[in-house]
């Protein structure tokens, strides 16, 4: 009957999975190596841009109807290279952790700082001076991520790309990803990332998603 068909159509919409593709921004200049670079607004290096273009040429990045990015230059530039025809939606909460006065410093430079010792020892509520604690950082990105998922479900947007920072992606996958793993198990190089599948029932019940592939993907034979 017509009523039955409408009911099944509504159920199909409710049950439709959402896909989010996380991509870590390309590489920044090697002079920043081993430094805490969070909200410092450094651009991609020329080498980083070339590496992204090469990845884009040799491999396959997923398509989507929505593109979200951190406000920081290195993420926006990554969007311009990988998705030149899409207009990204800038979300401030997708920014990397704010390391405050520790920005631009190495662990070696900070090793005698008592606050730093507590922070590096895993104390989630310890804040760098004028920065944010790891607990604050986690709360910020979790609220943002859940808002994005809710928005995708409400608008029927099945595919989205999030271009952000390694710390953001690793933390979100450790909290919401299956198989369960620690943040550093999800570490990735610049230009790489992971795709997750969000099934509405599983999300509403347990707030979890399935990490099902690394990206970019190898090109299939004959693909340009």
Question: Language-model segments: which ranges?
Answer:
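N-terminal amphipathic/basic-hydrophobic helices that include classical n-h-c signal peptides
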Residues: 1-14
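Conserved histidine-centered catalytic loops in small-molecule metabolism enzymes
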Residues: 16, 62-93, 174, 197-224
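Generic beta-sheet signal
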Residues: 20, 156-166
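Active-site-proximal alpha-helix that buttresses catalytic centers in soluble enzyme cores
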Residues: 23-86
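Glycine-rich phosphate-binding loop signature in dinucleotide/nucleotide-binding domains
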Residues: 60-63, 148-158
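Short beta-strand scaffold positions
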Residues: 69-70, 139, 163-164
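Phosphate-handling substructures
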Residues: 82-142
């Amino acid at each position: 009957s017509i009523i039955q068909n409408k009911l099944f159509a509504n159920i199909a919409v409710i049950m439709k999975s959402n896909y989010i593709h996380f991509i870590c921004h390309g590489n920044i200049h090697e002079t920043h190596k081993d430094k805490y670079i969070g909200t410092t607004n450094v651009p991609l290096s020329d080498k980083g841009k070339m590496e992204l273009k090469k990845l884009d040429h040799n491999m396959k990045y997923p398509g989507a109807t929505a593109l979200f990015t951190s406000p920081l230059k290195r993420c926006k530039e990554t969007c311009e290279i990988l998705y030149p025809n899409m207009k990204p939606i800038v979300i401030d909460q997708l920014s990397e952790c704010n390391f405050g006065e520790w920005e631009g410093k190495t662990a070696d430079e900070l090793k005698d700082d008592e606050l730093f010792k507590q922070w590096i020892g895993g104390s989630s509520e310890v804040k760098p001076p004028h920065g944010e604690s790891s607990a604050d950082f986690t709360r910020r990105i979790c609220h943002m991520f859940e808002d994005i998922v809710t928005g995708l479900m409400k608008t029927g947007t099945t595919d989205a790309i999030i271009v952000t920072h390694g710390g953001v992606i690793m933390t979100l996958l450790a909290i919401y990803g299956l198989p369960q793993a620690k943040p550093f198990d999800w570490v990735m190089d610049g230009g790489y990332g992971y795709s997750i599948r969000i099934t509405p029932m599983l999300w509403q019940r347990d707030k979890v998603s399935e990490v099902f592939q690394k990206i970019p993907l190898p090109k299939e034979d004959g693909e340009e």
